[in-house]
Structure formats: structure tokens, C-alpha cells
């Protein structure tokens, strides 16, 4: 992973100052966005159903304000993305939009189907935890395989760790006694309109129907094909 761009105070000899500046850090696992959205709403994501990064940036910065602190913490928001060669042109505009909203973007070519960005995210979090006093860490990811243990370690060390994801896919954060969880749809302005989903953690008193995400015939045909394979 290429060295992250620097924030914070550096002493004359090139080392980070002993009085490490406070930092609120947001990291976002971008490769999961459309896949997770499709799982949650049972349809191909559209522009209207994708999260608004500008609104989320405003929410994150607002959460860094602390009237009791002598000075506000530094704030940094980073999006991590795998870039398939065939999608370079279409992703270029998206990356530039993110940068214009104040996000740093770590982009890496996706050369193999199983290429993952998680370790790059964890490396950056670790670096910031050493170079700064990591006051608050906000992680946009529902992937608990790689994040649960290191995030809980940071929480034990005194960092406020918040996981933002869809409740349908973030069981590791919801069940954790150390991590805070926020459903992404509860972030003010995160979506232009309510998503077509029914949340089990926010059911109406008289109940709600959860529509199938695949037709009954398609599901039966898929089962039959697997059985005969």
C-alpha cells in the first residue's frame, strides 16, 4: 500500500510530535456499496438508492464538534476502492466527486476476483492510531470477518468506534458490547428518499410484509439445477 498522505503535526526531525493531535477518522469500504445495497433492497441500485457522500461528510464533521474541547479535532474521511480495469472510465467521475466532497480516495487496481481492500483500510487505521490520538473512528462496512477484532481492540484502548452499515449485514457490530452501531439510513440526508426495505429493528407495531427478493419459480429452478449438477 502506498504511504498515506500526512495529517497532524510533525516535529523537526521527521517524527510525529509527542503531543499527538486528536483525530476523528472515517473509513469507507467502497467495494461493498452496490453489492450490499442490492442485497438489502432486492434490486439493482440506482442513483436515488445510493448514499449521498456529501451529506455523510457533513454528518461526520458535525459529530466532531465538541464545545467542551479547547480546540476541535482534525477530521479525515477516506474511501477505499478497488478499480477493475474495465471500469476505470466510469469510476473516474465518481472518484473526482468524492475528492470534491473532502474525501481522500485510496484506489487500487482489482486484478483478481478475490482482491480485497480490507487490509489497506486496517493499515491506514493503524497508522493514524499511531500518528494521532484517534478520538473517534467511523467505519462504513458491514464486513465483520476482518474488522471485528481490530475495531474492538481500538475501543478497549479508548477510541470511540462507530460502525455504520445496514443492520441486515452488520450483526458483528450490533452484537458487540464495545462497538457503537448506526444504521446508515439513520444518518440524516444519507439517501434522497427512503429505501425500499423493512428493518427488523424498526418494525411497525402492526407488523410488515417482507417481499421476496427472487421469484418463487426462479428459486425453485435454481435449487433443481444445483441438485442435478
Summary of predicted features, one role per range:
Residues 2-115:
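Domain-level signal for Mg2+-assisted phosphodiester chemistry and nucleotide/NA-binding surfaces
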Residues 89-228:
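Nuclease catalytic cores that cleave nucleic-acid phosphodiester bonds
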